[in-house]
């Protein structure tokens, strides 16, 4: 029982670690352990106020690094959504609750990034993370329904 909770916590800590790493490049593993520096001028209001960078589109190009970053967002947050799902009790709305937990964590993670020099939090990444969670939960939902319908057809 505790194993599932530990795994979801480790996944959340892993995501937070990468979010706390400035100038992170997926294509350059030497950047995966950069020391972080807090932006002491940043405030929650300066991040979330209308017109802030949080709502802007990406200013960097569409290259291999960009594609790998977005694939990492989709896959890491997709797995996290599944872990949230497996940690919830068997209740109605379990898929939705797992997705809402995932979306909330994605939002908080992007806010966290906005406080780190060399990182930027974007609402677009919250949407990509949430899409990744929805996609993985959709695959799980279809897998479970196919499995259930096969059992029903055998009867």
PLM region spans:
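Bulky hydrophobic segments
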Residues: 1-114, 123, 130-147, 151-155
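Sequence-specific DNA-binding recognition helix
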Residues: 120
């Amino acid at each position: 029982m505790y194993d599932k909770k530990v795994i979801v916590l480790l996944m959340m800590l892993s995501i937070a670690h990468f979010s706390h790493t400035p100038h992170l490049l997926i294509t350059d593993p030497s950047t995966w352990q950069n020391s972080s520096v807090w932006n002491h001028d940043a405030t929650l209001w300066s991040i979330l106020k209308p017109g802030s960078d949080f709502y802007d589109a990406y200013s960097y190009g569409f290259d291999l690094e960009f594609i790998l970053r977005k694939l990492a967002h989709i896959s890491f947050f997709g797995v996290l959504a599944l872990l949230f799902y497996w940690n919830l009790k068997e209740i109605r709305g379990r898929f939705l609750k797992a997705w809402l937990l995932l979306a909330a964590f994605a939002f908080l993670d992007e806010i966290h990034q906005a406080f780190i020099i060399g990182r930027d939090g974007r609402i677009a990444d919250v949407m990509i993370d949430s899409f990744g969670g929805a996609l993985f939960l959709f695959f799980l939902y279809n897998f479970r329904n196919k499995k259930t319908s096969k059992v029903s057809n055998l009867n």
